[in-house]
């Protein structure tokens, strides 16, 4: 069996265990030195002046928007192809997600579609760097600048990615990251962070994540309880040192998939930027259900990211669904192949051979 993912600590196991034991021995579990140091180290890795650790990637998105003044009555333009949490984050602060279709090659927010979705109520654009593929940030920033809009980048699947030679997260006013265990930089539970170049925003976010407190038991504003705990921060510090190596592995394995699948009757989304970090490796097939069943029978585990566009989710798009035909088509055809650090080239060859067998003449 070739698993889709393997989340057990492997090469990093000794570092992870040492990090956990260090926190337990210290006896300080929330808002302590591990978080403070991780924030400094993660900011440096992202080439950002400031990082603020929070409880989840969803909270990171919601707090970034809220910290920038987005709230009830405002509209935020985002992509319909994503995990639903991107839209949930907008709704959590009382704003309204407005969906603009995706670029059929990048599979990320299309700048022209975003421009067409701007109204007098639009306050921000939230592009999602999906699957590790950077959105077209120069084009999106041009739309934002033309309409005087904020930009918050959803980098939850794009740790260390770059676009046009710049780190993702460096284009907008703030960026949100997730450390959910499946992410390129994953914790042993939930976690998230916000990066920004604005010192005042960073200080504000640190208050918001801790109940709006300016001092212990002194709540100056309405905040939330969303803190990246010390054990997760310590684990992330340990794994951050492995992230460049893991990113190189993902890129090498993806290049092998691309080489091996060249000419196969499936569509492999284009790599528009060498800064792609391959959180996932999706392919497109109009025969997805049959292909997935065939791969399962051959011992290859696959998943679908994502089977339903956010515009078709009743809880998240209660009004008339936006017209996003590209996202609809991608959701009908997309299938994610196994990809993770530790996956071997032999496994990639076996996956490709299984794909060949599906398409071989009877």
Predicted feature locations:
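Phosphate-binding glycine-rich loop
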Residues: 28-75, 86-93, 99-101, 166
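N-terminal "arm"/small-domain region of PLP-dependent enzymes with the aminotransferase-like
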Residues: 1-28, 33, 338
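Conserved active-site segment immediately N-terminal to the catalytic lysine
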Residues: 153-188, 215-220
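Structural detector of well-ordered beta-strand residues that form the stable sheet scaffold
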Residues: 52, 77, 98, 151-152, ...
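Hydrophobic/aromatic ligand-binding patch that stacks against planar heteroaromatic rings
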Residues: 89-90, 143, 167, 184, ...
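PLP-dependent aminotransferase-like
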Residues: 66-155, 162
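Conserved SAM-binding loop
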Residues: 53, 78, 99, 194, ...
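PLP-dependent aminotransferase class I/II
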Residues: 35-41, 45-51, 112, 124-128, ...
């Amino acid at each position: 069996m070739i698993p889709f993912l393997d989340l057990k600590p492997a090469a990093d196991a000794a570092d992870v265990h040492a990090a956990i034991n260090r926190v337990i021995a210290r006896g300080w579990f929330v808002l302590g030195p591990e978080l403070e140091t991780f924030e400094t180290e993660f900011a440096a890795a992202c080439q950002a002046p400031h990082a603020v650790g929070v409880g989840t990637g969803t909270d990171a998105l919601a707090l970034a928007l809220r910290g920038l003044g987005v709230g009830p009555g405002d509209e935020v333009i985002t992509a319909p192809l994503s995990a639903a949490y991107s839209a949930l984050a907008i709704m959590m602060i009382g704003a309204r997600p407005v969906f603009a279709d995706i670029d059929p090659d990048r599979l990320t927010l299309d700048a022209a579609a975003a421009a067409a979705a701007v109204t007098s109520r639009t306050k921000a654009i939230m592009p999602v760097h999906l699957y590790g593929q950077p959105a077209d940030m120069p084009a999106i920033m041009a739309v934002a600048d033309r309409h005087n809009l904020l930009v918050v980048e959803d980098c939850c699947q794009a740790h260390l990615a770059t676009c046009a030679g710049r780190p993702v997260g460096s284009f907008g006013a703030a960026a949100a990251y997730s450390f959910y265990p499946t992410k390129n930089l994953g914790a042993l539970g939930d976690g998230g962070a916000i990066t920004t170049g604005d010192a005042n925003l960073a200080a504000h976010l640190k208050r918001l994540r801790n109940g709006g407190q300016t001092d212990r038991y002194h709540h100056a504003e309405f905040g939330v309880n969303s803190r990246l705990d010390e054990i997760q921060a310590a684990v992330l510090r340990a794994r951050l040192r492995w992230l460049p190596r893991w990113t190189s592995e993902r890129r090498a394995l993806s290049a092998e998939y691309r080489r091996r699948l060249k000419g196969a009757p499936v569509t492999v989304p284009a790599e528009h930027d060498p800064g792609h970090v391959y959180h996932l490796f999706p392919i497109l097939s109009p025969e997805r259900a049959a292909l997935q069943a065939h791969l399962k029978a051959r011992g290859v585990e696959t998943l679908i990211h994502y089977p339903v566009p956010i515009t078709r989710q009743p809880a998240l798009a209660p009004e008339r669904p936006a017209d996003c035909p590209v996202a609809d088509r991608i959701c009908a055809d997309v299938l994610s192949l196994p990809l993770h650090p530790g996956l071997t080239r032999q496994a990639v060859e076996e996956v490709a051979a299984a794909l060949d067998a599906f398409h071989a003449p009877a």
